[in-house]
């Protein structure tokens, strides 16, 4: 589903008068972002949720993925905090998403790309799900070296 760009948006509105304004803004964002949502992810989700066995299998797989991402976040935190930076990188243990902004600027991201073959958007958003036990030390060392040049 990740590659299919499935998503969900929920907005709680306490004042009825604000509802049309919010709907208008959301429609504007939708129009500039993707215009028409893909139908394939919705069909996948429908199939998964209608079948108890598929739903259970999916939930088990999600639990495994969440645990692995949490483990990699913690490993990233431990590695980056080795030199007394615990407070600076504490957010890594507090977050749970696939991506995290790690505080690099565009110049530092370019250094990582050129010197270490580590790719991420210029805003410093790292894909934690792309980390594993084989590359975490390499990534941590490169990030620390890049941060030292700040």
Which residues make up each language-model segment?
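Active-site PLP attachment segment
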Residues: 1-21
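A structural signal for short secondary-structure junctions
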Residues: 2, 39, 91-94, 120
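Active-site-proximal structural scaffolding
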Residues: 2-4, 19, 38, 69, ...
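Short, well-ordered loop/turn and helix-capping segments at boundaries between secondary-structure elements
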Residues: 12-13, 50-54, 82, 145, ...
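Structural signature of PLP-dependent enzymes
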Residues: 23-42, 48-77
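Conserved PLP-binding catalytic core of the aspartate aminotransferase-like
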Residues: 57-115
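PLP-dependent enzyme catalytic core of the Aspartate aminotransferase-like
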Residues: 104-150
